[in-house]
Design a protein with these regions (language model features):
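A generic "binding-loop/recognition-motif" signal
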Residues: 59-60, 137
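C-terminal edge-of-domain segments
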Residues: 119-200
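Short, structured beta-strand-loop surface elements
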Residues: 62-117, 123-129
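A short, compositionally biased
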Residues: 17-22, 70, 135-136
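Short Pro/Gly-enriched beta-strand edge/turn motifs at strand-loop
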Residues: 20-26, 112-117
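Short solvent-exposed loop/turn micro-motifs enriched in small/polar/acidic residues
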Residues: 19, 36, 124-127
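Extreme N-terminal tail/first-helix region
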Residues: 1-25, 192-194, 199-200
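Short beta-strand segments
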Residues: 21-59, 65-67, 73-79, 86-93
Length: 200
């Protein structure tokens, strides 16, 4: 049962990312005296897995400089339209920066002339072009489409955590957050998880 729920949550997360075309918000840490910095990015998933996310960028941008100082980051995705309200937040670490010289195979899977040539006129060999390799260690999500943590007044997203590397990938498991009944009562107000008034 747990394996089935985990697989459904992973499928839901992948669907949200696919539904928004990979467009998400990357948040990086700017240091102790500054708020986090966020910007819109396009996430690329190879082989339809959440193990590794690639983000194309210019190596001279603020995000690359910030990640060189603190590699922890998050990428958030939110759907609109038919499945409005479904969201995914990936929390993890940028493990390396990839350029054409060290990973031609990965770059060839991500590079699209129509998307990237306006920014990198020299093509994938442009010295400014690089990929950030982001490894999520936690996924938070809500998906009404897949009935994952989707109660109207639930206030508890499903959480997946990365547990073990397995050769070419990793495995994930659903994590149950320890939340007090008092905190849930405050989050939900005078209503149950389905949004119905609680009896007096």
């Amino acid at each position: 049962m747990v394996a089935k729920e985990t697989a459904r949550a992973l499928r839901a997360a992948l669907d949200v990312i696919e539904d928004v075309g990979g467009l998400g918000l990357l948040a990086t840490n700017c240091g102790p005296d500054h708020p986090p910095n966020s910007r819109v990015v396009k996430a690329h998933l190879l082989d339809s897995k959440l193990d590794t996310v690639y983000i194309a960028t210019n190596r001279y941008t603020d995000k690359v400089q910030e990640l060189a100082k603190n590699s922890l980051a998050s990428v958030s995705f939110y759907t609109n339209g038919a499945s409005a309200g479904d969201y995914v937040v990936l929390r993890g670490k940028v493990t390396r920066t990839i350029d054409f010289g060290n990973e031609k195979k990965v770059i060839s899977k991500v590079w699209r002339d129509e998307d990237m040539l306006p920014f990198f006129q020299g093509g994938p060999q442009d010295e400014r072009f690089c990929l950030l390799e982001f490894k999520p260690h936690e996924v938070s999500l809500i998906s009404a489409k897949h009935n994952v943590a989707a109660k109207d007044n639930g206030w508890r997203p499903a959480k997946l955590e990365r547990v073990m590397e397995e050769g070419a990938g990793c495995s994930w498991r659903l994590r149950e957050d320890d939340i007090s009944s008092d905190r849930l009562r405050r989050l939900r107000g005078a209503y149950d998880a389905d949004g119905r008034p609680l009896p007096e």
